[in-house]
C-alpha cells in the first residue's frame, strides 16, 4: 500500500490510497457490505455511483457462508463480484456487540455463534488468517472495542489488551502483502488515547484507525476525543474513523484530519425511509409526502430523483415494496458519494472552510 498526501487545507487532507485492487481518492466514504453485499444494491450499481472501496465484515463472513466457500472462489473480490478495493474489519466490534454471549481472555474471545449456537474462539491470529483468506486490501488488527461507559481503569485495561493483541496481529500478518491498520482505543480518556497512539505508532502500521467512538457516547465526547487524537497520528499515513457517521459528522471529521470513513447509516436509514438531502433529512413515510410530486431532492441526479416522485417513494416504503428500499438506498449512497466528492473538490480548491459554512447553512434550511 502507498498513501500520497496531495494537499491540505487547514486540518483537512486530500490524498490517494494505492491498493492491490486500485487507487482510492481520499477523503473516502466506504459503504458497508456486511455479508459481502451492500444491502439492496448490486456491485455494478455501487460502482456506477462512483464508489471506489467497500467495507466487509470478517466476523459475519467467517460464520456465514464460511471460509471454505470464499476460498473456493479465490477470495472475497471474486465471491462478491467486486474488483475494487475492500477493507475488512477484524471482528472485534461484532464480538463486543454480543454482550453476555462472549467471554474475553488474554488469548482471545470465546463466544456462542449467533447463527447456530456453536462454541467459537476468535483470536488475533485467527482474525488475521481469516482476512488473509478473504484477501482484503486493508486488514484491521483484532482489538477489543472499549465499551461506553467505562471507568478509567476499565478503559486502560481494555486498551492495553488491544495493544498486546495489536502486536500479535502484526506478527500473524507477516507475509501478507496487503495493508494492516492499527486501531487507537482508550475510551473517553485523552491520556489513554495518547498511550494507545504512541505504542501503535511504534509498531509501524500501514495506517491508523480511531476506534471506540460512536458507541453511545455524547456527541461532545466524540468530538473532543477525535480532535485530540487525530493530529497525533502520522501525517504520512491514512487516518480512518470507524463507524462514523452522519453527513455533519463526516464534514467535521474531515476538518479534524480524517481520510477514511464507513457507516451503515445511509443504507440502514434508507430501509427505514429516512433520506439524506442537501437540506437535511426527509422521513418519507410521513403523511406530508403522500401527494408530493417533486423528486426527493431537486438538485440530486441519482436514478431515484430523476425518475420518481416523493409520493411514489412514500407509497413504496409504506407498502413494504422491495423497490422502495432499493430506491432509497441508491439515493442515500449517491448523496454520501457526492458529499465526499464535494469535500475533495473544496480541499483541492483551498476553499474547505467556505464549503463547511455553505454545507451547514443549507442543511439548516430543512424541508
Curated annotation (Swiss-Prot):
It catalyses: 7-aminomethyl-7-carbaguanine + guanosine(34) in tRNA = 7-aminomethyl-7-carbaguanosine(34) in tRNA + guanine. Binds 1 zinc ion per subunit. Gene3D superfamilies: Queuine tRNA-ribosyltransferase-like. Pathway: tRNA modification; tRNA-queuosine biosynthesis. GO terms for biological process: queuosine biosynthetic process; tRNA wobble guanine modification; tRNA-guanine transglycosylation. Its EC number is 2.4.2.29. Catalyzes the base-exchange of a guanine (G) residue with the queuine precursor 7-aminomethyl-7-deazaguanine (PreQ1) at position 34 (anticodon wobble position) in tRNAs with GU(N) anticodons (tRNA-Asp, -Asn, -His and -Tyr). Catalysis occurs through a double-displacement mechanism. The nucleophile active site attacks the C1' of nucleotide 34 to detach the guanine base from the RNA, forming a covalent enzyme-RNA intermediate. The proton acceptor active site deprotonates the incoming PreQ1, allowing a nucleophilic attack on the C1' of the ribose to form the product. NCBIfam families: Q_tRNA_tgt, tgt_general. Belongs to the queuine tRNA-ribosyltransferase family. This is Queuine tRNA-ribosyltransferase.
